[in-house]
């Protein structure tokens, strides 16, 4: 059996998000979907998986809410169900930057995946990866700046040491688009005026460009049991240990906490993975 994996987010005011939880959970359970949907006053963020008909039905349901009528999503496929249960969670933020009163309407301009390579090759464009360190170690765009953050909440702290001119163009990217979109709003709140982000993130880039120019190097970490996908969005069987670069079976990583992409030897030697 083949499963459709759909990822989506949408920044929109959901003042009644508390009341939406049970109804959305029931709709997902009725069509046997699994995955996680996050709801907050600022919008929705999710990755869900199920059969083709179930995915179609849930998006018909979600888009029947006028606030979500413009909801779009990205799809990939797997031969197994990458989630064990269906969860709908209430959050303060749909992606946790930890900055209060951020005006998301300040967000930067989209760069379509087909234009990303040409745009980021310009000498006056700085490319910033907004993902976590363990994600960047698996793969990144050439010449992208790595902030070396362990979680998204550390990004504002990193910007305090970011000394580049605010007149430069800044292009930001992440896995599916949500972190880079929110971080562009934050960068603009700091006074950077020419800020851009990759529409749909790395997953959309790989889907639409096939990485034909080789600008993407490595694999892309994903937040489900696939662990990582390659250039063709196919789940990887093995990936590099982020410490020693030896290959690790992704099957061995499905039951460990998020981000622990390490081989057995490094796990024993590294205190942070042996608590």
From Swiss-Prot:
GO terms for biological process: tRNA modification. Gene3D superfamilies: 3.30.70.100, Rhodanese-like domain (3.40.250.10). Signal peptide: none annotated. The keyword tRNA processing applies. Its EC number is 1.14.-.-. It catalyses: uridine(34) in tRNA + AH2 + O2 = 5-hydroxyuridine(34) in tRNA + A + H2O. Catalyzes oxygen-dependent 5-hydroxyuridine (ho5U) modification at position 34 in tRNAs. This is tRNA uridine(34) hydroxylase. It comes from Wolbachia pipientis wMel.
């Amino acid at each position: 059996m083949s499963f459709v994996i759909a990822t989506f987010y949408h920044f929109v005011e959901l003042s009644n998000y508390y009341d939406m939880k049970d109804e959305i959970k029931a709709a997902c359970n009725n069509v046997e979907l699994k995955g996680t949907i996050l709801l907050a006053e600022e919008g929705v963020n999710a990755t869900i998986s199920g059969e083709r008909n179930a995915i179609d039905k849930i998006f018909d349901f979600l888009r029947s809410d006028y606030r979500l009528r413009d909801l779009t999503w990205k799809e990939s496929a797997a031969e197994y169900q990458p989630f064990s249960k269906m969860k709908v969670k209430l959050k303060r933020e749909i992606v946790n930057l930890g900055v209060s009163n951020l005006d998301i309407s300040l967000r930067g301009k989209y760069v379509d995946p087909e234009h990303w390579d040409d745009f980021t090759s310009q000498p006056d464009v700085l490319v910033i990866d907004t993902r976590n360190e363990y994600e960047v170690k698996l793969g990144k765009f050439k010449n992208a700046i790595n902030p070396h953050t362990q979680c998204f909440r550390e990004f504002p702290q990193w910007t305090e040491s970011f000394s580049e001119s605010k007149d430069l163009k800044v292009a930001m990217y992440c896995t599916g688009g949500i972190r880079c979109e929110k971080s562009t709003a934050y960068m603009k709140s700091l006074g950077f005026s020419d800020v851009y982000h990759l529409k749909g993130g790395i997953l959309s880039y790989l889907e639409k460009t096939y990485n034909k120019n080789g600008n993407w190097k490595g694999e892309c970490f994903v937040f489900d049991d696939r662990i990582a996908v390659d250039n063709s969005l196919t789940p990887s069987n093995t990936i590099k240990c982020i410490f020693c670069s030896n290959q690790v079976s992704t099957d061995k990583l499905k039951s460990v906490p998020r981000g622990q992409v390490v081989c057995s030897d490094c796990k024993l030697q590294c205190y942070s993975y042996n608590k």
